[in-house]
């Protein structure tokens, strides 16, 4: 969330890394490495910050967030962004600490905190080594384009993928991840404004209100 277990089990619009998924991967024994001329999976950055737009079929909505990703220490922080006034919409901060097996959900306005066990083990945001190379192409137009590579969990020429990952050919930055179930896109995440490193490691430290955290996940609407 590849056989790695389901990679990112997404249970809510902000949980790309459980949130998964933080993540929904089902890579079931992918094919052997390609021929000598076939590109090999690159190594995605271990620590970066950026933004994401997440579309989830279950809600039919896009959600935006700031992301701090620390693969070295197996932790992720996601901060909801407000791009429009949505009545009865609560914004949260999510701190996922996989080494501790716990996620903190903090309401931005009140600092109310929920502490929730993480059921899935850490699974990095990267290209699994047994992925299938699909294509390489440029995004944008003349003078303003970037080369990317597309990978999937497709096993043979006749099978269908359940995961598609797009990463830059240079530096291996994540661009987009898409998860498919029963021929339908269930989750799609676009990454942008990616910068290497973590400016402030304290973003992974829960606020003091989490010392008395509630054990249940808070809802995204106005009701508790």
Swiss-Prot record:
Detected in brain (at protein level). One of its GO terms (biological process) is myofibroblast contraction. Disulfide bonds join 42-172, 88-222, 113-210. Glycans are attached at residues 130, 182. N-glycosylated; the glycan contains mannose-6-phosphate moieties. GO terms for molecular function: calcium ion binding; ganglioside GM1 binding; identical protein binding; phospholipid binding. Belongs to the ependymin family. Homodimer. This is Mammalian ependymin-related protein 1.
């Amino acid at each position: 969330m590849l056989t790695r277990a389901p990679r990112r089990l997404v249970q809510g619009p902000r949980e790309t890394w459980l949130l998964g998924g933080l993540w929904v991967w089902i890579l079931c024994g992918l094919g052997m490495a390609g021929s000598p001329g076939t590109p090999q999976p690159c190594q995605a950055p271990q620590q970066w910050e950026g933004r994401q737009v997440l579309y989830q079929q279950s809600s039919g909505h896009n959600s935006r967030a700031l992301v701090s990703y620390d693969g070295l220490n197996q932790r992720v922080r996601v901060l909801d962004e407000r791009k429009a006034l949505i009545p009865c919409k609560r914004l949260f901060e999510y701190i996922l600490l996989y080494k501790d097996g716990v996620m903190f959900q903090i309401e931005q306005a009140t600092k109310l905190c929920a502490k929730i066990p993480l059921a899935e083990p850490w699974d990095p945001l990267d290209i699994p080594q047994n992925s299938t190379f699909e294509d390489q192409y440029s995004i944008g137009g003349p003078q303003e384009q970037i080369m990317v590579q597309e990978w999937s969990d497709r096993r043979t020429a006749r099978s269908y993928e359940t995961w598609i990952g797009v990463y830059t050919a240079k530096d291996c930055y994540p661009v987009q991840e898409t998860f498919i179930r029963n021929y339908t896109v269930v989750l799609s995440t676009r990454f942008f404004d990616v910068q290497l490193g973590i400016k402030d490691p304290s973003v992974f430290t829960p606020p003091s209100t989490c010392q008395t955290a509630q054990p249940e996940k808070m809802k995204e609407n106005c009701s508790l």
